[in-house]
Amino acid sequence: MKLQTLLFCPADAERKVSRALDSAADAVILDLEDSVAASAKAAARSAAVHVLAGATTRPDLVVRINPQDTCWYLPDLVAVVPHKPRAVLLPKCTSPDALRRLDHHLEALEVANGLPAGMIAILALVTETAASLRCMAYDGVTPRLRALLFGAEDLAADFGISPRHVDGTLTAPIAAARAALLVAAAQAQVPAIDTPWPDPRDPAGLQAEIAAAVRDGFAGKLCIHPNQLAPVAAAFTPPPERVRWAEAVHRLFMDHPTSGVLVLNGKMIDRPHLKLAERILEAVACTSDEV
């Protein structure tokens, strides 16, 4: 599942959904949560089912359900699982136990609907308050987990602060949680996906945040407008010279499988360099062969 560009749209906004489905997004997230008013939850759920029922293979369809502590959570799952979304996005995920509950509910509904157990993947939008940062051990929780997603806006609301300074950089508590999520994703061996840039009319701000995300090790970025997709995709696609370096590192270690340290173009490389090279080649494979 390619996760460089994930585009949110309200499930009940027909025009926005149509535009999203025609976009170059890797995945379209049909939102049943924040962008849908309480009075419109049932209608949005029905709209999501309609989209899923008529889905083609491109882009992948993900449904952001409502949080587990709401009355809409189970009805959302009951409605969408029979129509086989590529993944379910769990918002406000505050602990591994939340993923275990979702995994249990998905398996029960898959079996009830004659679907293979484990068919539907999970994306977790992690909202970590100061009290729950110590609980970010997501490794081994469920094989459905495909990525951890960072949500700066939800977290800032929990803290009662602004997520960003005037210059666009993240405020200290948000930056700390972002770093913790990167570590948690690495431990769980899943990609980390960065928070959306909130202003589609500010391409300079978007570019600055994308550059930081790439530098810090995120694998993709959430988007809230189609015009954010191209710059995000371009930034997360490894440049040709980086790909050539990765291919050379990989080839050198394949030729010398018992070596721990080698020399490439006069520079020492070791096993951590091989891991980095493999990540780069995996990103290239996802770009050229979307699974």
How does the language model describe each region?
Residues 1-291:
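Expand to "…catalyze enediolate/carbanion chemistry for C-C bond making/breaking, isomerization
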